[in-house]
Amino acid sequence: LKGGFKVINIEDVTKSIDILSKTLQSLNIDSIFIEQNGKTEKYFYKEEQLHELRSCAKLLVAMAIGIAIDKGLSIAGEPLTLNTKVFPIIKDIANIINKSNINKIKEWTIKDLLTHTTGYETQMMSERFIQDIDKDKLVDYALNYDIPYEVGTRFAYNNVEPFILSVFFQEAFNQNLTDFINENIFKKLNVLDYKWENYGKYCPGATGLYLKHSDFHKIGQLLLNEGKYDNNQIISSNWIKEMCSMKLETPSAYKSERVLPKIGIGYFTFISRDGYIFRDGSNGQYI
């Protein structure tokens, strides 16, 4: 002890720092951006490169739907809303052999798709499940996969809903969802370099989007600043609040050992046990 304080051996400190450094390096972290009160700190950030966002791409789909609603886009004279049903638009592009699914698909609304409450039982359409399926046949694959539960009653996380929203959007408005997102979000954020390959002729919606680290950070700023970027309102504040408010509890997604255990879902966002709003993707993507 010295002056009432315990003196730590500098060699022990150096050893601990070395162990921590090696541990962090083994995690293969590409970048961490932290923003608070308008200030951004960057860690592990070495160079700009396109990085796959995995399921964080779903955020862009939810944002795009909100923009489309706020713009007043309409179908056959009826404005697009959360209660708009998708079946009238997608029925003619799919060969639904599983007839027990039809009545449930007829009930699907935009809101059901945004909250993963379409009636599926479990996760499906992840890359490992569809790698051998013709991407032009994915609409048929999704709509013929058994839907055992009532629509709007049960959360089951999967990649179907963002994809179906993308298909619906393109068929309803004759525009690929990626192009709409580019015009209404990316260009306004000065996102110039990105990659989002189609599933067949449709934007995947759920995954497959590549952005630079700093551009991914801009998407987070839209959430943090209620739709604003550089003092410009890119997405309405009301829609961002809607996206980030809990729509239903998600007991099937809760895992207590996680840093952010999921207790509820918004529109392709999650709410943690401690009230944090976030979106995650496989292999450690968080926003």
Residue ranges and their predicted role:
Residues 34, 39, 126-151, 175-194:
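Short, charged, amphipathic alpha-helices and their helix-cap/turn boundaries
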Residues 164-168, 205-228, 285-287:
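Active-site-proximal alpha-helical segments within enzyme catalytic domains
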Residues 46, 146-150, 162-163, 199-204:
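Flexible glycine/proline-enriched surface loops and loop-helix/loop-strand junctions
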Residues 71-118, 144, 172-211:
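Active-site helix/loop module of the DD-peptidase/beta-lactamase fold
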Residues 38, 52-82, 165-169, 219:
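Active-site SXXK
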